[in-house]
Amino acid sequence: MRNWTSVALATLIGTATLSLAAVSPALADYPERPVTFIVPWPPGDLEDQLTRIIADEMTKATGQPAKVVNRPGGGAVEGSNAVATSDPDGYTVGSLVIDVVTMHMIQGNAPYKRDAFEPVGIFLTYPFALVAKKDAPYSDMAELAAYAKTGEVKLGHFGYDLIPSMATFVAAKKLGFKFSADAPFDSLDCSTLANGDADVINTTMATVLGCLDKIKVIAAYTDQPLSLFPDAKLLSQQVPGLDITLWNGFFVPKGTPQAVKDKLAAITEAAMKTQAAQDIAKATGAGVYWMNAADSAKRIAKAYTDAEALVAALKK
């Protein structure tokens, strides 16, 4: 695998380098200085782990240092705005979730506009879920709804104006219940449940790997069963119309040279085929792949429309 990856990476980088040289001698040596990848969340989750693998591959392929900077805050708005306002030269790259280019703009939370970013590509689909402790008195959305109508259920989420949070609130509305309390967290993991900070949490499987034997999945926010909990029902099966898929990709400021984006894409595509990236996919059930800029743009457009529908559903 290692030898194949080295050959594939060399081929992809060579192709991108030829493209750079054809466009501009000044860009042919990109990167000529360190590249910063901004992750607008704390360290540890899937986007952080995979971005670090990509940064390492860039360093190996180009000889230039590449680093990951975590800038959490505002449901990813703070770090994302740092990308949007950076120079369009390829030296600041955002590793951004679906909400950054959809829900935050729809809700008016973002200081940047819809055309602030250009997609390099998408490389991750999250194994996202609504999770509870194993001894919780409910195992699916119907049982949760029945319990919450008379009992207390505290929800932990990553932010009010994020797609999974909005989907959870829409699901509760359609099922006729309200959470007794809810709060946003920068990080949601085993300790959140163990400490009683929340009774159910919206999170990814990567953050609860250390307590898989102590939790249950109430609903999977995916289009396919979770590999770690294959019997868990999809949210869309339990609440028709809520077809939720959450992804992450690389974005650069508008106006970044195409040749630079091509080189970033080549490095990322090769990195997703490495053993390290595939090990993460196997361990967590994450979708690890490469979707090019054109296909990513179509996916983003659909996600924007779907996010608008979530907002409308909550206002009814």
PLM region descriptions:
Residues P42-G44, I98, K133-Y138, H157-L162, ...:
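Short coil/turn segments
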Residues A8-A21:
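Bacterial N-terminal signal peptides
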Residues K113-F123, F179-D182, D199, A206, ...:
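Short beta-strand->loop
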Residues L20-A28:
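Sec/Tat signal peptide C-region and signal peptidase I cleavage site
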Residues M1-W4:
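Positively charged n-region of N-terminal signal peptides that target proteins for export
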Residues E32-P34, K174-F177, A259-K316:
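An extracytoplasmic/periplasmic, membrane-proximal ligand-sensing/linker region
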Residues L27-D115, G151-E152, I163-P164, A172-N202, ...:
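N-terminal (or domain-start) structured segment
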Residues A82-Y91, M105-L188, L235, T245-I280:
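Hinge/capping helix and adjacent helix->loop/strand transition within the periplasmic-binding protein
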